[in-house]
C-alpha cells in the first residue's frame, strides 16, 4: 500500500489554497476507488483548518509561514523515524517554494527510502511581481529555486505564461539540462473542481446589471479604482465582496449573478478570479498584462496603461468610463463565445490529469 501525502500550504482556510488541497485529495481518492488501486491519500496538517469566510482579514504573516515550514520538517522526521514512509510514496507540495522540501529529500536519502516529490510553482524571484524578486541582488534566490527544482521530481506550472517566466532561471548549460530533463516539468493545476461544481449548480442564474470586485481590496489590487467607478456610474450595481463577506456558496452565487468582474491587479496571479468569472458566464474586465493575456480573450481586456497606477487611471478616466458603459450596454454582444472559452479553460487549465498520469502510471 503506497501513501500519497498532500502537504498543507496554509494553516487557515483561505479562499483558494484549502480548496486546491481538498480537490486534489478528492480527485485522487475517487480515481483510486474507481480503479481499485492500493493507495491511500493523507493530508499533513500542522494545525487543523478553521472555517472562515471567503475573505480572510488576517492573512498569514511571514513568521507564520516559517513556523509552518519548520513544523512540516519535524513531521517529516517523525514519519521517517516511525517507518511511516515507504519506498515509492508521493509527497505533494501546493507551493514549491518551501525549504521543507530540502529536509524531506535529506530524510529520504539518509533513511534510504526513495520517494517522489511533486511541487506546484506559484511565485519566485523569476516573477517580477513577487516579493521574492524585490531584492537588488537575486543570486541566492535563483540558486535556491534551482535547487528546489532539482529536489522535486515533478515540477508543475499552470500556464504557458508562468512556464516562460520559470525558464528565465535556467540559462546556463547545466541549468538548461536540468530544466529540460525528461519528465521534470509538467502542466497541471491548481485544481478547481469546486468551481466547476458551482458553475453547474448556478447554471442559468439570471444576470443582473452587476459589476463585481471579487478579491480582497489590497493595495496591489487597486480597489480605489473600483470605488471611484462605482460613484461615477451609480446606474449599475457595483458589489465588492469585502462589503458582503460572503461564504463560498454565496460568493459563487454573486459570480453567477454578475455580468462583469472588474480586475485591476498589479501583481501576477494564476488568474483564478478570471477563470471563476468565465465559468459562471461573467465577463472579466481585465488589464492587458500579466497572465490575463493567456486566460482572458483580447476582446475583454482593456489597455494595461489605464490602471498601471492611480495616476494612470485619472489620466484615462474618460476612456474607462466609456469602456464600462459600452460593455454594460452591449453585454449580449460581448458575451458571445463565453461558453466556448469556458470549455477551453475547463479542458486545458486548472486540472491535475497530468499528475494523475504520473502517480498512477496511466498509459495513454
Language model regions located:
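Active-site proximal beta-strand in glycosyltransferases
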Residues: 90-95, 108-131
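N-terminal pre-catalytic "stem/leader" segment of glycosyltransferase-like enzymes
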Residues: 1-103
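Short hydrophobic beta-strand element within catalytic cores of glycosyltransferases
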Residues: 283-286, 293
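Aromatic "clamp/platform" in nucleotide-sugar-dependent glycosyltransferases that forms part
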Residues: 265-267
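A charged, aromatic-enriched C-terminal amphipathic alpha-helix characteristic of glycosyltransferases
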Residues: 70-71, 307-364
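Conserved catalytic-core segment of nucleotide-activated headgroup transferases in glycan assembly
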Residues: 17, 193-248
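Membrane-proximal helix-turn-helix segments that form the acceptor-binding/catalytic region
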Residues: 134-155, 256
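Donor nucleotide-sugar binding/catalytic pocket of nucleotide-sugar-dependent glycosyltransferases
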Residues: 150-199
Amino acid at each position: 500500500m503506497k501513501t500519497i501525502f498532500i502537504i498543507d500550504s496554509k494553516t487557515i482556510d483561505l479562499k483558494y489554497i484549502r480548496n486546491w488541497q481538498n480537490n486534489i485529495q478528492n480527485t485522487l481518492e475517487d480515481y483510486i476507488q474507481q480503479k481499485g488501486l492500493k493507495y491511500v491519500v493523507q493530508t499533513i496538517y500542522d494545525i487543523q483548518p478553521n472555517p472562515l469566510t471567503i475573505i480572510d482579514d488576517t492573512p498569514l504573516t511571514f513568521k507564520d509561514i516559517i513556523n509552518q515550514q519548520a513544523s512540516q520538517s519535524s513531521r517529516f522526521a517523525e514519519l521517517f523515524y516511525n517507518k511511516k514512509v515507504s519506498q515509492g510514496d508521493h509527497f505533494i507540495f501546493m507551493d514549491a517554494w518551501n525549504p521543507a522540501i530540502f529536509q524531506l529529500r535529506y530524510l529520504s536519502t539518509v533513511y534510504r527510502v526513495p520517494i517522489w516529490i511533486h511541487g506546484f510553482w506559484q511565485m519566485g524571484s523569476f516573477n517580477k511581481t513577487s516579493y521574492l524578486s524585490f531584492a537588488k541582488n537575486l543570486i541566492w534566490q535563483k540558486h535556491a529555486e534551482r535547487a528546489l527544482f532539482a529536489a522535486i521530481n515533478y515540477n508543475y506550472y499552470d500556464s504557458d505564461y508562468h512556464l516562460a517566466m520559470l525558464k528565465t532561471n535556467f540559462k546556463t548549460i547545466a541549468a538548461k539540462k536540468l530544466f529540460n530533463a525528461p519528465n521534470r516539468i509538467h502542466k497541471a493545476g491548481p485544481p478547481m473542481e469546486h468551481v466547476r461544481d458551482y458553475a453547474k449548480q448556478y447554471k442559468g442564474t439570471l444576470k443582473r446589471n452587476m459589476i463585481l470586485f471579487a478579491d480582497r481590496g489590497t493595495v496591489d489590487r487597486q480597489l480605489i479604482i473600483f470605488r471611484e467607478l462605482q460613484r461615477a456610474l451609480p446606474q449599475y450595481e457595483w458589489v465588492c465582496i469585502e462589503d458582503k463577506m460572503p461564504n463560498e456558496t454565496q460568493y459563487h452565487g454573486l459570480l453567477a449573478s454578475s455580468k462583469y468582474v472588474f480586475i485591476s491587479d498589479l501583481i501576477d496571479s494564476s488568474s483564478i478570479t478570471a477563470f471563476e468569472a468565465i465559468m459562471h458566464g461573467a465577463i472579466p474586465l481585465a488589464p492587458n498584462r500579466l497572465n490575463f493575456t493567456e486566460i482572458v480573450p483580447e476582446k475583454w481586456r482593456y489597455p494595461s496603461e489605464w490602471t498601471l497606477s492611480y495616476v494612470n487611471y485619472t489620466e484615462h478616466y474618460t476612456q474607462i468610463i466609456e469602456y464600462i458603459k459600452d460593455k454594460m450596454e452591449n453585454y449580449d454582444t460581448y458575451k458571445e463565445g463565453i461558453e466556448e472559452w469556458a470549455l477551453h479553460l475547463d479542458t486545458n487549465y486548472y486540472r491535475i490529469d497530468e499528475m494523475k498520469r504520473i502517480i498512477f502510471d496511466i498509459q495513454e
